[in-house]
Amino acid sequence: MSLRLITWDVKDTLLRVRVPVGQQYYAEAKKRGLCVNPGTLETSFRNAYRSHSRLFPNYGLAQGMSSRQWWLDVVLQTFRLSGIEDSDTVQSLAKQLYQDFSTAHNWALVPGAREALDSCTNLGLRMAVISNFDRRLEELLRQCCLERYFDFVVTAESAGVAKPHLGIFHKALSLAKVPPHQAVHVGDDYVNDYCAARMVGMHSYLIHPKTPPKLQWNIPEEHVIQSPEQLIPKLVGVLKNSMT
């Protein structure tokens, strides 16, 4: 194939939270004199996130919500489920946590991510982002010194649909003016990244640090990488084959 575009997922593909969410919520609550177990907060967060994603998909855009309000509600529900009712203290805490997760301080590069992006740049490949993140992503990428690698960023909020909806991939391909068979998508989610990209006609690779994924999914072993930098030899091979 002739390769012209690489699109990347972000969370747990290029960036990951520096400290588990429950620990971060606990630390902020402790500053305000609230006593709650970090493990309880972690479980409550997962339940609140899952519930809000089901009731108000894609940050509640169809229901007229903003992504900021969606996240504030998730935080409030997390503390309710942990036995702490709403108060001015929790409202203030929620706003602080929303702001904290907007900054590079709470995020770390996935090992091998920058090396992979540098290598793709050196290979002359265009790159973009397709992510289910919200409107904070571009600023976060800027703070993490990653924005320079990408021609554009497509988020679920800006596209109006979230992965695995094919519309978000079509939007990226349209912006790049590249046909799907000349594009590769890389991400850590089997359904949202690997399968959805292939359904639209793109090539895709799954980042899966644990082995063996073939026991879980029907996926060729050569389509699985354990870190972003493992993508590069595969791309080099594709580029060499396209020139012969």
UniProtKB/Swiss-Prot annotation:
Q: Which InterPro entries match?
A: HAD-like_hydrolase_domain, HAD-like_sf, HAD-SF_hydro_IA, HAD-SF_hydro_IA_REG-2-like, HAD-SF_hydro_IA_REG-2-like_cap, HAD_sf
Q: Which domain of life is it from?
A: Eukaryota
Gene Ontology cellular-component terms for this entry are:
nucleus
Q: Membrane-crossing residues?
A: none
From the UniProt annotation, give the residues forming the signal peptide.
none
Spell out the family assignment given in the record's similarity comment: Belongs to the HAD-like hydrolase superfamily.
Q: What is this protein called?
A: Haloacid dehalogenase-like hydrolase domain-containing protein 3
Protein's organism? Xenopus laevis (African clawed frog)
In the UniProt record, the gene name given for this protein reads hdhd3
